[in-house]
């Protein structure tokens, strides 16, 4: 009993001492006591975050800087701006060694000139299985244009029966005679063509007759004048000459194309 009283006195003295110090003691801790026991956020230990590494531009690091293109169209990655090359780039892009939009270009000028040279070079014409060129007519080359109006204008300046009324001059009897024979065939067809062109005084003695057209384009009166003329031209000879003239016109047009 004495021991119990002694213990209460000690405990009472302890409580009085705490009250004197401004502290209260309770058997059940209050929420305020629990909050005081927790450490404050200011006193919590914070771990330092590692600094972000400086990202290097893959375009600047590439050795192929001339044709290197960095694809910066990856929308899933953030876009960065490089101050040295002044371009945006992303991590999800890819490097390419070819220029965008590059490629070989065909030389269109050389192709067109080659095609033009092929068009201007005519093939040798043929008639009745005989091949001849138009280069032997009065010295004209394949690239020169034959002025037929000038040739027919010489009709009123030449004598009838001359072989130079169409600008052929003396080639009909020279080395080009083989070409002319290849075009007209026999000597009879060549004679008929001569009547068609007006040789042999077949009615073209009139200087204004050259403006009337060809013999097969004239009316009946003109045919009568041709028959009356001193040459004695006939209709069958005119038809044969017209056929020969058509063949020669076709050959000349092929040479000029």
Swiss-Prot record:
Binding-site list for Zn(2+): 57, 60, 82, 85
GO cellular component assignments: nucleus
Ranges of compositional bias, category Polar residues: 24-33
Recorded phenotype for the gene knockout or disruption: The pear1 pear2 tmo6 triple mutant variably displays reduced radial growth. The pear1 pear2 dof6 tmo6 quadruple mutant plants showed a greater uniform reduction in radial growth, associated with compromised symplastic trafficking.
Keyword Hydrolase recorded: no
PROSITE patterns linked: ZF_DOF_1, ZF_DOF_2
Subcellular location: Nucleus
Biased composition annotated in UniProt, kind: Low complexity: 110-121
One GO process term, biological-process aspect: regulation of DNA-templated transcription
Span of zinc fingers (Dof-type): 55-109
Induction, per UniProt: By cytokinin in procambium. Induced by the transcription factor MONOPTEROS (MP) in cells relevant for root initiation, and later in vascular tissues and hypophysis.
Domain of life: Eukaryota
Matches recorded under Pfam families: Zn_ribbon_Dof
Keywords: DNA-binding, Metal-binding, Nucleus, Transcription, Transcription regulation, Zinc, Zinc-finger
GO molecular function terms listed in the Swiss-Prot or TrEMBL record: DNA-binding transcription factor activity; transcription cis-regulatory region binding; zinc ion binding
Region of interest (Disordered), ranges: 23-50, 104-127
Summary of the tissues where the protein is detected: The PEAR proteins (e.g. DOF2.4, DOF5.1, DOF3.2, DOF1.1, DOF5.6 and DOF5.3) form a short-range concentration gradient that peaks at protophloem sieve elements (PSE). Accumulates in the stele.
Function according to Swiss-Prot or TrEMBL: Transcription factor that binds specifically to a 5'-AA[AG]G-3' consensus core sequence. The PEAR proteins (e.g. DOF2.4, DOF5.1, DOF3.2, DOF1.1, DOF5.6 and DOF5.3) activate gene expression that promotes radial growth of protophloem sieve elements.
Name of the protein: Dof zinc finger protein DOF5.3
Annotated source species: Arabidopsis thaliana
